[in-house]
Regions:
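Catalytic-site microenvironment of enzymes
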Residues: 1, 5-6, 10-19, 23-46, ...
């Protein structure tokens, strides 16, 4: 049994209650850690464990509360995005950031499942879903300026906001029974609210790909950027490989900055050299319906995008949740309630497609 203990003072840690038949080796393997780490954290002298014994699986993590947080281990140096070109370099190696991100995600996942009602329906049980938060790492995506209600200039960084939406989608999908993974992960935060919304997320370059082996290289070049987009597909393909036939999906989440496109979401399906991926287009059509609003109609388009090519998921799409070129949409995405609203719409699109596949 995995437990999550968290409070602003105590920090955050993951614990495991030993069951009959468990060994230190099996516990370490299951939770992607090492026997040495577990022994050190719990001050164990031998490898013997006993049923009912509670072991700490992760070091205690310092939690930093902030208007645009919380953050874990370390928080941004700036309280908000200072200007269009502002960014903060990683303070740790890709390997360490990967390990920290994994600890956070395991804690997040355990917390979701611990709070889930036992009798809740799980219509997505048996599905494997890949969420691909756009950009991240070295690549911030779009950075646009916006004005608050008090005419104060603030800046919106695409990758930081779509990662927050991806985490909100992740949570809802897990509650519905799906197995879910992220292609890109952050080492110092989970879901974040903005209170007030003018405390915009800072462009931190610390995100990494969700791939332990890939992050062993001691180079900042392994962090997400336009030159290694194919790594997203590799992470996705590894996850969906064991899925049941027709029970895997890939959803890439973005917020584009396109002057020539009207307001509202855009769903992109895979189209290459005039040939349309029918399953991708079918999924896109269902998602477009889910995202549609009378004042901001959703659109649909076929394109040959790197994250959709050679993708082994049953159906793959890219969703531009907002077009932040428009001041109104850049204004909206700063609010966590808007991000939660769009996360639920994305989930409703996934659910609708899953029901269609029955």
């Amino acid at each position: 049994m995995v437990l999550l203990l968290a409070s602003p003072l105590a920090g955050l840690s993951v614990f495991y209650k030993v069951r009959k038949g468990d060994s230190l080796w099996s516990i370490a393997k299951k939770h992607q850690t090492s026997i040495t780490t577990i022994k050190r954290i719990n001050k164990l002298r031998t490898n013997r464990v006993y049923p009912g014994q509670v072991l700490r699986l992760t070091p205690r993590i310092t939690k930093y509360n902030a208007p645009n947080g919380p953050y874990y281990w370390q928080k941004p140096r700036a309280s908000r995005q200072r200007h269009r070109n502002y960014s903060e370099r990683p303070r740790s190696s890709p390997g360490l950031d990967y390990r920290r991100a994994q600890i956070l995600l395991r804690a997040f996942d355990n917390e979701i499942l611990a709070k889930a009602p036992r009798k809740r329906r799980k219509p997505l049980k048996g599905w494997r879903i890949v969420l691909d938060p756009g950009h991240g790492g070295i690549d911030p995506g779009a950075i646009v300026s916006n004005l608050t209600g008090q005419k104060q200039r603030v800046y919106v960084v695409e990758d930081e906001y779509v990662y927050d939406i991806a985490l909100r989608v992740y949570k809802e999908l897990r509650l519905l029974g799906a197995e879910v993974t992220l292609t890109v992960i952050s080492p110092n935060h989970l879901i974040r609210d903005n209170l007030p919304a003018k405390t915009t997320f800072v462009h931190e370059k610390n995100e990494v790909y969700n791939d332990e082996r890939y992050n062993r290289r001691n180079s900042e070049k392994v962090r997400p950027r336009s030159a290694n987009l194919s790594q997203r597909v590799r992470v996705a393909n590894r996850f969906v490989k064991g899925a049941r036939a027709g029970r895997s999906l890939f959803v890439s989440l973005h917020a584009d900055n396109t002057p020539g496109r009207p307001m509202g979401p855009l769903v992109i399906y895979h189209k290459r050299r005039g040939r349309v991926d029918r399953r991708s287009k079918s999924f896109a059509r269902v998602m477009r319906t889910a995202l549609h609003q009378p004042d901001m109609p959703a659109q649909e388009r076929g394109r040959n995008l790197a994250v959709l090519r050679n993708n082994l998921a049953h159906a793959e799409i890219l969703v531009e949740v907002h077009n932040v070129h428009h001041q109104h949409e850049a204004y909206q995405i700063r609010y966590h309630k808007d991000r939660q609203h769009h996360a639920k719409k994305v989930v409703s699109g996934i659910l609708a497609y899953a029901r269609k596949k029955r």
